[in-house]
Amino acid sequence: MLREKYGHPDIAISVDGQPGSDWLISYFSDQVRNGVSFKAGQTVQVGWALLKLADGDAGELTVSEPDFASMPVHWVGGSSRVMRHLILQREVCDQIGEEPCFPSMIQPGVVSPSFVGGRSAFTMSRDDEGWLFKADDDDGEGARLCSLYAVGIERTAVIPFLALPPGAVVEWKSGSAEIEFKGQRYSSQSNSFLDRLLASPALI
C-alpha cells in the first residue's frame, strides 16, 4: 500500500492480534504520508522502547523489537511486546490523570548496588534528570548508571511505571505498589488496575 501510494517500501508488521496494532500501522502510514522516509537499520521509538527496521525478502521493510531478555539487545521479529508496554504505560499514567512522559530505553537511570538482579522491595523516583532506582535494603552508597533497558530486563516490575512524569515516586514490594504524585497517593490496595497489574505479571 505504501509503495503504490507513495513510492515508499511497504512496512510489514507482525502483531499477533495485539491491541494497539491498528495504531502502529496508522503511525507508519501517517509518517510516510507526511514525507518521512524509513530505511533499513533505522530505529523508531514507540513508547519507551525501540523498533528496528530491516530489509525484507520482497523489498519491504520488516519490523523487529527487543526480546526484553538479552543484553546487549537481541532483535526479534514483531512488535507485540513494545505495544503491550505502550498500552500499560499509558494506562498507569491515566490512573493519576497525567499524560505519559516516555523516556527512551537507551537513557540511563541511577541504580543502587543490589537493585539490578535483586528481588527485594524498591522505590523508583523520577526528576528532571531521569529515574532513580533504589532497593529498600541499600543504603544509597555505590550507585551507578544503567540503561533503562538493562534495568527493565532484570526488574520487569518497573516497566509499567517508566512513563510516569517527573515528580512521581513508586514504592513497590511483593503484593503491593503505590504511586505518589503531586501530594496524592494511588495504591494497588484501592486501585483495581494496579491490583490487576500486580496479580498478572505476564501482562508485562
Task: Name each region found by the language model.
Residues M1-A54:
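N-terminal leader/presequence regions that precede the main folded/catalytic core
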Residues I11-V15, L145-A150:
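A short, exposed loop/beta-hairpin motif centered on an aromatic-Gly-Thr core
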Residues T43-H74, A150-S188:
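Short, compact, well-ordered microdomains
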Residues G47-T123:
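Surface-exposed beta-loop interaction hotspot
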Residues S120, A143-R144, I153-A157:
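Extended amphipathic alpha-helical regions
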Residues S125-D138:
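A short, structured beta-strand/loop element
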Residues K182-I204:
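Polybasic, proline/glycine-rich intrinsically disordered low-complexity segments
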